[in-house]
A protein has these predicted regions:
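Acidic (Asp/Glu)-rich catalytic clusters
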Residues: 18-25, 44-64, 91-99, 130-137, ...
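Histidine-acidic metal/acid-base catalytic patches
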Residues: 2, 156-284
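Conserved, mostly hydrophobic/aromatic
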Residues: 20, 66, 84, 95, ...
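Active-site beta-loop-alpha junctions enriched in small/polar residues
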Residues: 6-10, 33-35, 67-70, 108-110, ...
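Alpha-helix N-cap and loop-to-helix initiation/capping positions
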Residues: 39-47, 75-87, 113-125, 150-158, ...
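N-terminal pre-domain/capping segments
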Residues: 1-67, 71, 75-93, 282-284
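Active-site acidic/histidine proton-transfer and metal-coordination neighborhood
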Residues: 57, 73-173
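A general structural detector for well-ordered alpha-helical segments in enzyme core domains, enriched
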Residues: 16-19, 47-54, 87-94, 118-129, ...
Length: 284
């Protein structure tokens, strides 16, 4: 597994590469623009070229763009839904400009309408984003959820239904968040639990759909349905869980991205990256 983190890209998108290298990352994720506004982020060819050049000269192996927080691809509010689809399409366009490998998106909540109506809206949203992508190799990764408030993608069966809804388009993949898995009731702390989770994923979605992991410890208990990230080893998952995860052959060659609060509360930091690198190297 390649260890990385969510990094800042302010002051010039190419600085995301510099910030990742400074943290000791082998992979990075960042927001294309402000995560709390609808304003689309498009890059000049000069800035995009500078980003691609910086990446080529760095040890960064994977680049992911995370969509904005506002997105709800299952929203029952038509205006909000249209803005969400537009934002998803914008992220695909930005990723293609920069040569990013994939975008990661939260799916959203059906807001009480039920899973099936929500699924139909997600299907339409993904279809429009994929149409916009055309022949681009950029993949759209659906992130699982902890399970609160009617959120979509709480288990592998729901994620599989979304993949099936777009006829198994190979450009649709998964980003699994370890904290969300645990908080939704998936045991990852024991070898048996981790193996069962991997088998469940393979039986429903297929392991080939897994493109990225978000490596976050959890402040809340197994099955809490409460999304609260914690620094690696400081939460209910603990170091042994992450030692298993970063060294498991099923995840070999995949990027593992930290989204933890960081020791100073300012986001992922070098110490959390180094913890995971040490675990991958066999330290306990």
């Amino acid at each position: 597994m390649y260890i990385g983190a969510h990094v800042r890209a302010s002051g010039g998108v190419w600085k995301a590469i510099d910030n990742g290298v400074e943290l000791g990352c082998e992979a990075i994720q960042f927001f294309a623009g402000s995560p709390r506004t609808w304003k689309p982020q498009l890059y000049s060819e000069k800035d995009a070229a500078r980003f691609r050049e910086a990446r080529a000269a760095s040890p960064i192996r994977f680049v992911l763009i995370h969509t904005i927080y506002l997105i709800n691809l299952a929203s029952t509010n038509e205006d909000f839904y249209e803005k969400s689809v537009t934002a998803l399409v914008g992220a695909v366009v930005a990723a293609e400009q920069l040569g990013a490998d994939a975008i990661v998106t939260h799916i959203g909540s059906h807001q009480g309408a039920g899973f099936e109506p929500g699924l139909r809206r997600v299907q339409t949203a993904l279809g429009r984003a994929l149409d916009e992508a055309g022949d681009s190799p950029v993949r759209v990764l659906l992130e699982n959820t902890a399970g609160a408030g009617g959120t979509m993608g709480v288990d592998f069966a729901e994620l599989a239904a979304m993949i099936d809804a777009v006829d198994g388009d190979p450009r649709v993949g998964l980003c699994l968040d370890t904290a969300h898995l645990f908080e939704s009731g998936v045991e990852l702390r024991t070898p048996e639990g981790l193996e069962a989770a991997i088998a469940g994923l393979d039986a429903t979605c297929g392991l080939d759909r897994l493109v990225c992991l978000h490596l976050n410890d959890s402040k809340t208990a197994l099955g809490s349905n409460r999304d609260r990230h914690e620094n690696i080893g400081d939460g209910d998952l603990g170091l042994r869980a992450f030692a298993q995860i970063v060294n498991h052959p099923a995840f070999a060659g995949l990027p593992g991205i930290l989204e933890v609060p960081g020791d100073a509360g300012d986001g992922p930091d070098r110490s959390n990256v180094e913890r995971l690198l040490a675990l991958r190297a066999g330290a306990t």
